[in-house]
């Protein structure tokens, strides 16, 4: 988060920024960066010492390791949504609950809901011809469907932030009324029932 880095007396990277679910900063209500705004290099704070040679300048985590751009001065983009603020609000609540849980605080997180969300996102990443869930939900919320190059299976953790954000928004749209919307997707032949349930050790009652 550029705003977090700008406000730090000593800039540091939060562990929560590494969680695939977290695509935005709840405090500053802006999207997280995963690439340098200036040179498009991946943001990798652990590379900050690379290539310094005999330079006396102390490296800072707020600078791009490749071009030294000040990441704290990057544009702050508001989280986008396509259908209504409700999907974004649901997604933000999950991020808030997971963060509270990781800090040992009281949390309202339902792990069964996160299990379903992850399964739905995995199905939207599928490239099988029998699975149209990605296109189906994108059409429902008025978003452009993400196209996946090649045939290699991709995990959400390896996706660019903008793709993770859109997929999680699409999953959040389904989770706002899961019984109704997932059933409708199945009836529209956007997903097969056996694909929907195959990765669950214990399915939610609903």
Residue ranges of predicted features:
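Basic, alpha-helical nucleic-acid-binding regions used in initiation and control of genome expression
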Residues: 1-206
